């Protein structure tokens, strides 16, 4: 019986990669299951210790700073204890959990590490409290508040309102940072970035203003206007000779100043005449010349030739 080479080639091309992929997936699955079992064993070992620590903290929080007989703890009454005395009063060893009880909830690795770090910090705080004196026991117990189970599972943020779990140093730092940010915002609001200074009246404008105020009625008999009173404090109001007018009893005639002013490329005094000067005109934008050329282009060719 002859073997078909095409069938063998197709079988090898399909079956061989699939077999290798399945084998690799099985290897990874076995490693993952082994890792889960190891984590479950660690959880079983630490669960008893966590339960004991939480129970002990709740008992201490409920009993307060005094003992069951209304007396302070032994280590606090004796003063600062030695290292041997503190070692004897450490938390009891965790009781092993029953082997038949399986973990119902999965806890990720970062949460376990966080719980371990919190338990270590709390144990250090307990040792410091145990070795402290009886006078400072109450203040340290108030500052180093015990962490509850809710705080271990859900992070609690600091707020302005005082709470039993708030750290005084963190609250003071937060108030200082808020005060510094508010002062920075106030200073930025008071500063004038990018604004132009107040325009002071020039000599010509001041003279025109004085002439207008004096031409309405007698300068000596009339009451000064609000504009004149407001400009009295300006340092440049009477700084020029042309702005000071003689005080006489007769009405002053209106003096017409020969001031050339442009408004929309037209002379103010003569609206019919188009001025050749343009304040926005340069060698690249010659509006007058371009307009003249455009008007000439609209005329008939014979008329342009005659001109």
From Swiss-Prot:
Q: Name one GO cellular component term.
A: cellular bud membrane
> What biological-process terms (Gene Ontology) are attached?
cell wall organization
Identify the stretch(es) annotated as Disordered: 61-137
Q: Which residues lie on this side of the membrane: Extracellular?
A: 1-7
Query: Spans of biased composition, class Polar residues?
Result: 128-137
The protein's UniProt keywords, in alphabetical order, are: Cell membrane, Cell wall biogenesis/degradation, Membrane, Signal-anchor, Transmembrane, Transmembrane helix
Q: Which family does it belong to?
A: Belongs to the SKG1 family.
Instruction: Describe its function.
Output: Plays a role in cell wall integrity. Affects the cell wall polymer composition in the growing region of the cell.
Protein name per UniProt? Suppressor of lethality of KEX2 GAS1 double null mutant protein 1
Which organism is the protein's source?
A: Eremothecium gossypii (strain ATCC 10895 / CBS 109.51 / FGSC 9923 / NRRL Y-1056)
Q: What is the lineage of its organism?
A: Eukaryota, Fungi, Dikarya, Ascomycota, Saccharomycotina
């Amino acid at each position: 019986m002859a073997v078909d080479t095409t069938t063998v080639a197709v079988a090898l091309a399909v079956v061989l990669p699939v077999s290798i992929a399945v084998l690799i997936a099985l290897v990874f699955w076995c490693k993952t299951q082994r890792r889960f079992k190891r984590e479950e064993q660690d959880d079983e070992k630490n669960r008893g210790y966590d339960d004991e620590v939480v129970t002990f903290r709740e008992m201490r929080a409920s009993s307060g700073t005094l003992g069951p007989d209304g007396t302070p703890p032994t280590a606090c009454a004796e003063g600062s204890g030695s290292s041997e005395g503190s070692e004897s009063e450490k938390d009891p060893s965790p009781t092993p959990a029953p082997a038949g009880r399986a973990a119902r909830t999965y806890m990720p690795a970062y949460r376990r590490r966080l719980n371990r770090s919190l338990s270590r910090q709390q144990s250090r705080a307990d040792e410091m409290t145990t070795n402290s004196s009886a006078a400072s026991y109450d203040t340290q117990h108030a500052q180093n508040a015990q962490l509850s189970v809710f705080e271990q599972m859900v992070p609690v943020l600091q707020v302005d309102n005082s709470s039993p779990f708030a750290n005084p140093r963190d609250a003071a730092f937060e108030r200082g940072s808020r005060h510094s940010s508010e002062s920075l915002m106030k200073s930025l609001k008071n500063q004038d970035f990018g604004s132009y200074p107040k325009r002071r009246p020039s000599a010509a404008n001041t003279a025109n203003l004085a002439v207008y105020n004096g031409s309405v009625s007698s300068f000596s008999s009339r009451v000064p206007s609000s504009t004149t009173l407001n400009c009295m404090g300006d340092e440049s109001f009477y700084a020029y000779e042309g702005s000071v007018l003689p005080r006489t009893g007769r009405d002053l005639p209106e003096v017409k100043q020969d001031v050339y002013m442009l408004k929309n490329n037209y002379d103010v005094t003569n609206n019919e005449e188009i001025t050749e000067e343009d304040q926005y005109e340069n060698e690249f934008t010659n509006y007058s010349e371009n307009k003249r050329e455009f008007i000439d282009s609209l005329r008939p060719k014979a008329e342009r030739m005659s001109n």
